[in-house]
Curated annotation (Swiss-Prot):
Pathway the protein takes part in: Amino-acid degradation; L-lysine degradation via saccharopine pathway; glutaryl-CoA from L-lysine: step 6/6; Carbohydrate metabolism; tricarboxylic acid cycle
Biological role: Dihydrolipoamide succinyltransferase (E2) component of the 2-oxoglutarate dehydrogenase complex. The 2-oxoglutarate dehydrogenase complex catalyzes the overall conversion of 2-oxoglutarate to succinyl-CoA and CO(2). The 2-oxoglutarate dehydrogenase complex is mainly active in the mitochondrion. A fraction of the 2-oxoglutarate dehydrogenase complex also localizes in the nucleus and is required for lysine succinylation of histones: associates with KAT2A on chromatin and provides succinyl-CoA to histone succinyltransferase KAT2A.
PTM sites of type N6-lipoyllysine: K110
Record keyword Magnesium present: no
PTM-bearing positions, type N6-acetyllysine: K154, K267, K272, K273, K277, K307
Region of interest called Disordered, as start-end residue ranges on this chain: 152-225
Protein name per UniProt: Dihydrolipoyllysine-residue succinyltransferase component of 2-oxoglutarate dehydrogenase complex, mitochondrial
InterPro entries: 2-oxoA_DH_lipoyl-BS, 2-oxoacid_dehydrogenase, 2-oxoacid_DH_actylTfrase, Biotin_lipoyl, CAT-like_dom_sf, Single_hybrid_motif, SucB
NCBIfam families assigned to the protein according to its UniProt record, in alphabetical order: sucB
């Protein structure tokens, strides 16, 4: 064993000497991962001493693309009121994406945030599973950049027309008819004697089995779907409102005759000047701001931590908008300084963003009062639930012709029921009823707003 080790050592020494002198055919070429002691040192290298000869063995990795071409995309920063969200992937590993193309969507408590691709490239890896929870700054996916945008697929060329079938050159000649027999053929003698039982010409058939009761009807089934984060948050907030607030609702009805007449008379001029349609929501938003200035307690809120009442000198009205994902409430800020055109423009912009699922969290943060319009769905009557941490909410309903007493006579007028749900811990019945009557007066006669009555 000892002699064998010495032989191996001598053979290795001779090879090493030949390598150092250049006699080895590989001595003049650089070997990957191996360098002589005269070469520079590397942080990932280690030195090996064999027969007083020092070698440096370097371990490394190589890649075909520069590191700068591989980008890690992280979760965008959330607002202070949002801590995490659920990821829903729109692309998979290996998909080619263009710059600003949506790769995934992060669903938070309030809205959905779309994460676009920062450049043209190919998805290398998805770092979070579908449905996984992420926080702000969490790595989402890696993208390998490419030079140009992905080419659109060319439309498939129409297949070549099939060659027309060859038409028959001549009609087929029918075969000659067989001769008609003039005599009946002889009756064959039976090989077995006939039995005494008659033979039926029709084979007996078995009646089909009777169908089970209810088999022809549709099958009864059920399926389950996980609640999305927005629906969970809505359920949580509404239950918090019921458990925290002492909610009470007061009602009134509004004659919509004058506001309908004003809209019909000025909608064309309004559209021509502002390029906006004149609706009823702007009238209720403006009337609510007018009433909130008269009754500031409705615009206030209780701070349960410090047991204080917070009065706001600004009016930010949240307008409820129904989307396929759930109810969202974007905020119209500083309504007290707006006119009808400003309100209509803001409502149009927020509604368009809500339908396209482009609302940012900043669009829904805050709000001192909420208006919910169930009338667009044909609602006749209802009691809305407060949107915490606010103290009141106005519920609008449908406009229906009803007989009402006007000056001692019965007339048919377009009427709307309105409901005000408020936190009775802070707002007394007198303030709530006065507030709702202010809205009624401003909508029934818009001149009240002009004259500040």
């Amino acid at each position: 064993m000892l002699s064998r080790s010495r032989c191996v050592s001598r053979a290795f020494s001779r090879s090493l000497s030949a390598f150092q002198k250049g006699n080895c055919p590989l001595g003049r070429r650089s070997l990957p991962g191996v360098s002589l002691c005269q070469g520079p040192g590397y942080p990932n290298s280690r030195k090996v001493v064999i027969n007083n000869s020092v070698f440096s063995v370097r371990f490394f990795r190589t890649t075909a693309v520069c590191k700068d071409d591989l980008v890690t995309v992280k979760t965008p920063a959330f607002a202070e009121s949002v801590t995490e969200g659920d990821v829903r992937w729109e692309k998979a590993v290996g998909d080619t994406v263009a710059e600003d193309e949506v790769v995934c969507e992060i669903e938070t408590d309030k809205t959905s945030v779309q994460v676009p691709s920062p450049a043209n490239g190919v998805i290398e890896a998805l770092l979070v599973p579908d449905g996984g929870k992420v926080e702000g700054g969490t790595p989402l996916f890696t993208l390998r950049k490419t030079g140009a945008a992905p080419a659109k697929a060319k439309p498939a060329e129409a297949p070549a027309a099939a060659a027309p079938k060859a038409e028959p050159t001549a009609a087929a000649v029918p075969p000659p008819a067989a001769p008609i027999p003039t005599q009946m053929p002889p009756v064959p003698s039976p090989s077995q004697p006939p039995s005494g039982k008659p033979v039926s010409a029709v084979k007996p058939t078995v009646a089909p089995p009777l169908a089970e009761p209810g088999a022809g009807k549709g099958l009864r089934s059920e399926h389950r779907e996980k609640m999305n984060r927005m629906r969970q948050r809505i359920a949580q907030r509404l239950k918090e409102a019921q458990n925290t607030c002492a909610m009470l609702t007061t009602f009134n009805e509004i004659d919509m005759s004058n506001i309908q007449e004003m809209r019909a008379r000025h909608k064309e001029a309004f559209l021509k000047k502002h390029n906006l349609k004149l609706g009823f929501m702007s009238a209720f938003v403006k009337a609510s701001a007018f009433a909130l200035q008269e009754q500031p307690v409705v615009n206030a809120v209780i701070d349960d931590t410090t047991k204080e009442v917070v009065y706001r000198d600004y009016i930010d009205i949240s307008v409820a908008v129904a989307t396929p994902r759930g109810l969202v409430v974007p905020v119209i800020r500083n309504v007290e300084a707006m006119n009808f055109a400003d309100i209509e423009r803001t409502i149009t912009e927020l509604g368009e963003k809500a339908r396209k699922n482009e609302l940012a969290i900043e669009d829904m943060d805050g709000g001192t009062f909420t208006i919910s319009n169930g009338g667009v769905f044909g609602s006749l009557f209802g009691t809305p639930i407060i949107n915490p941490p606010q103290s009141a909410i106005l519920g609008m309903h449908g406009i229906f012709d009803r007989p009402v007493a006007i000056g001692g006579k019965v007339e048919v007028r377009p009427m709307m029921y309105v409901a005000l749900t408020y936190d009775h811990r802070l707002i007394d019945g007198r303030e709530a009823v006065t507030f709702l009557r202010k809205i009624k007066a401003a909508v029934e006669d818009p001149r009240v707003l002009l004259l500040d009555l």
